[in-house]
């Protein structure tokens, strides 16, 4: 039995609150159970130097955790003078995932940065960040269209992500921290709303997993992501 009595293939309760802060063109608080992430999308004129003159836009992301997002305080990375490897890996993952569903040529020379700040962590912070960032990005593009800066929406669809894992004999969806820390296999899966794969990150922490288990993990992830995309779409109707 899971700590919150969910079914093995069930995601946690998901809540997406749009327009959460006043200034960002896209601002979302996304909650997966007790994991809470603030995703703010900011629009900037111009693109990185290496893209100038190509008529393309750019979407990037930054990720961080507040010092008391976890049970004990962690130092801000700024006090160490540099970002940690985990942080850099996660923010690159978020950015890659978003760009997979954006037509950069349709943006013109505009850059959007999505800042994902973890307020409270209980497993799945990177997957929650991707899910919330997708909605924040959609709102940022809607802002550009409303202002007449874009004629068509460069976003081709939603992107969402979920963690899956093997704990004992069970394949679980959307692991909270106590499950994640005990799992034999931990995997993060990113998909488009059509169920196409963007990224799969999986590791056997304990027992190696079989090809059949891999297929089961992906099937559970696909179902979970379909449920998450439904919440994303519903949130954009508000």
UniProtKB/Swiss-Prot annotation:
Enzyme class at the top of the EC tree: transferase
GO molecular function (one): 3'-5'-RNA exonuclease activity
InterPro entries: ExoRNase_PH_dom1 (IPR001247), ExoRNase_PH_dom2 (IPR015847), ExoRNase_PH_dom2_sf (IPR036345), PNPase/RNase_PH_dom_sf (IPR027408), Ribosomal_Su5_D2-typ_SF (IPR020568), RNase_PH (IPR050080), RNase_PH_bac-type (IPR002381), RNase_PH_CS (IPR018336)
Residues the record lists as binding phosphate: 86, 124-126
Documented EC number(s): 2.7.7.56
Function: Phosphorolytic 3'-5' exoribonuclease that plays an important role in tRNA 3'-end maturation. Removes nucleotide residues following the 3'-CCA terminus of tRNAs; can also add nucleotides to the ends of RNA molecules by using nucleoside diphosphates as substrates, but this may not be physiologically important. Probably plays a role in initiation of 16S rRNA degradation (leading to ribosome degradation) during starvation.
The protein's assembly and partners: Homohexameric ring arranged as a trimer of dimers.
Family, similarity comment: Belongs to the RNase PH family.
Protein name in UniProt: Ribonuclease PH
Source species: Vibrio cholerae serotype O1 (strain ATCC 39315 / El Tor Inaba N16961)
Gene giving rise to this polypeptide: rph
């Amino acid at each position: 039995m899971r700590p919150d009595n969910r079914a093995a293939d069930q995601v946690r309760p998901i809540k997406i609150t749009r327009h959460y802060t006043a200034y960002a063109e896209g601002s979302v608080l996304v909650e997966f159970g007790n994991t809470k992430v603030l995703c703010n999308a900011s629009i900037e004129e111009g693109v990185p130097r290496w893209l100038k003159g190509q008529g393309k836009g750019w979407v990037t992301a930054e990720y961080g955790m507040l010092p008391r997002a976890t049970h004990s305080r962690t130092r801000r990375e700024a006090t160490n003078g540099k970002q940690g490897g985990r942080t850099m890996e996660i923010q690159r993952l978020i950015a890659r995932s978003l760009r997979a569903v954006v037509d950069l040529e349709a943006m013109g020379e505009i850059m959007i940065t999505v800042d994902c700040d973890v307020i409270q962590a209980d497993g799945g912070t990177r997957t929650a960040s991707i899910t919330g960032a997708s909605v924040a990005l959609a709102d940022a593009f809607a802002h550009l269209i409303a202002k007449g800066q874009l004629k068509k929406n460069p976003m081709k669809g939603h992107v969402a992500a979920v963690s899956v894992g093997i704990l004992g004999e069970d394949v679980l969806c959307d692991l909270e921290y106590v499950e994640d820390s005990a799992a034999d296999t931990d995997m993060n899966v990113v998909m488009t709303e059509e169920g196409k794969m963007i990224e799969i990150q999986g590791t056997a922490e304990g027992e190696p997993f079989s090809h059949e288990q891999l297929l089961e993990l992906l099937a559970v992830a696909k179902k979970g992501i379909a449920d998450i995309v439904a919440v994303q779409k519903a949130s954009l109707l508000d």
